[in-house]
């Protein structure tokens, strides 16, 4: 499946139908009076988060969504038919942004969450509405309200509990494949991963979701490599797992490169809880492992896990550390949503 996480969409709600000018005409009724009906309301445009989608690719092939207008009113007090609403079905985690590309209109983070993007125009009044004690036969009606034209951006930020970070070929996809049901492409060359991948991880009877994004390189914030736009997909994560290639001779520099890109990206990403793991220890001798782990711990100021995605060494320890951070974040979120009771 092709992946698309940003697209521009043009929407228009339907206009209201015009009111009707009509008078009752029946045999033996000389002054039947007005009986013009109202116009129907125009269709509205909505966005709704649905299950089963993880890309915005459908919006590459259709960018224009125009709701139908309401039908005009008719005689005998008949109201025109209202236009049908249009619902844009988007993946959970989609942000809806105004045309200025800065103002967030809505953030759809739950299945079934819905937001009104453009209200349909009201139908015009028929002449029956204008009947009064002083005007028994009004000969006027209102036109319907026009629809609303709007341009919006849809931006997808995948919802995951943990995010994988690292330089290209740090072993992120191998780690994801070894710990989850995901089967990302794995090869011995940089930028094997071109789009984000999600995997469900199980540890001690608990499950959480890990997101693997394409590797970052120095200058990614300036557009080098694949850029840093994929970092948006780990913004919602509770914890980040930073994988460092233990076979690299510049292991400390590699670590600092990723940290620098996180800081350059901005937002709260650099301040998120972070776990560091030195990968590929199956290709290192014990002394190399000890020396490079010590150097990395000095640079990070904290514990560094040693793992091998290929051999499966140390993976459960890292997963338990990730779960501890995720479980704590979920507990804090529950406390924030507890309703107040006297």
UniProtKB/Swiss-Prot annotation:
Which residues are listed for GTP binding in this entry? 166-173, 191-195, 212-215, 279-282, 308-310
GO MF annotation: an example = GTPase activity
The protein's required cofactors = Mg(2+)
Annotated keywords: Cytoplasm, GTP-binding, Hydrolase, Magnesium, Metal-binding, Nucleotide-binding, Plasmid
EC numbers, comma separated:
3.6.5.-
Say which family it is in.
Belongs to the TRAFAC class OBG-HflX-like GTPase superfamily. OBG GTPase family.
Enzyme class name: hydrolase
Q: How does it assemble?
A: Monomer.
> InterPro entries recorded for this chain?
G_OBG, GTP-bd, GTP-bd_Obg/CgtA, GTP1-OBG_CS, GTP1_OBG_dom, GTP1_OBG_dom_sf, OBG_GTPase, P-loop_NTPase
> Which GO terms fall under biological process for this protein?
ribosome biogenesis
Please give the organism. Cereibacter sphaeroides (strain ATCC 17025 / ATH 2.4.3)
Entries under SUPFAM superfamilies matching the protein: Obg GTP-binding protein N-terminal domain, P-loop containing nucleoside triphosphate hydrolases
| Function field | An essential GTPase which binds GTP, GDP and possibly (p)ppGpp with moderate affinity, with high nucleotide exchange rates and a fairly low GTP hydrolysis rate. Plays a role in control of the cell cycle, stress response, ribosome biogenesis and in those bacteria that undergo differentiation, in morphogenesis control.
**Residue span, OBG-type G domain:** 160-327
Question: Could you say which residues bind Mg(2+) here?
Answer: 173, 193
* Domain Obg as annotated: residue spans: 1-159
Instruction: Decide whether keyword Cytoplasm is in the record.
Output: yes
Q: Give its localization.
A: Cytoplasm
What GO CC annotations are associated with the protein? cytoplasm
The protein's name in its UniProt record: GTPase Obg
Source taxon at top rank:
Bacteria
NCBIfam families for this protein? Obg_CgtA (TIGR02729), PRK12297.1 (NF008955), PRK12299.1 (NF008956)
């Amino acid at each position: 499946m092709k992946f698309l996480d940003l697209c521009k969409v043009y929407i228009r709600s339907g206009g209201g139908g015009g009111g009707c000018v009509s008078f009752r005409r029946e045999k033996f009724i000389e002054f039947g009076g007005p009986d013009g009906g109202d116009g129907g309301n125009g269709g509205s445009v909505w966005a709704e988060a649905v299950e089963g989608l993880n890309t915005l690719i459908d919006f590459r092939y259709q960018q224009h969504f125009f709701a139908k207008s309401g039908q005009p009113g008719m005689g005998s007090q008949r109201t025109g038919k209202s236009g049908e609403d249009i619902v844009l079905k988007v993946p959970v985690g989609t942000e809806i942004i105004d045309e200025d590309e800065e103002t967030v209109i809505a953030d759809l983070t739950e299945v079934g969450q819905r937001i009104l993007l453009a209200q349909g125009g009201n139908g015009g009044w028929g002449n029956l509405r204008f009947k009064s004690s002083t005007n028994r036969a009004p000969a006027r009606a209102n036109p319907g309200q026009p629809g609303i034209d709007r341009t919006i951006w849809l931006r997808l930020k995948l919802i995951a509990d943990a995010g994988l970070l690292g330089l290209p070929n740090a072993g992120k996809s191998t780690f994801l494949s070894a710990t989850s049901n995901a089967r990302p492409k794995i090869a011995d060359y940089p930028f094997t991963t071109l789009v984000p991948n999600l995997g469900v991880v199980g540890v001690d009877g608990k499950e959480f979701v890990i997101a693997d994004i394409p590797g970052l390189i120095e200058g990614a914030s300036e557009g080098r490599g694949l850029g840093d736009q994929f970092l948006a997909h780990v913004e919602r994560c509770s914890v980040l797992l930073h994988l460092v290639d233990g076979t690299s001779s510049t292991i400390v520099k590699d670590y600092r490169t990723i940290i620098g890109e996180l800081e350059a990206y901005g937002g709260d990403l650099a301040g998120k809880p972070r776990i560091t793991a030195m990968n590929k220890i199956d290709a290192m001798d014990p002394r190399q492992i000890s020396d490079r782990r010590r150097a990395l711990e000095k640079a990070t100021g904290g514990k560094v896990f040693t793992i091998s995605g290929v051999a499966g060494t140390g993976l459960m320890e890292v997963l338990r550390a990730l779960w501890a951070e995720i479980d704590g974040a979920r507990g804090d979120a529950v406390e924030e949503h507890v309703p107040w009771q006297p």
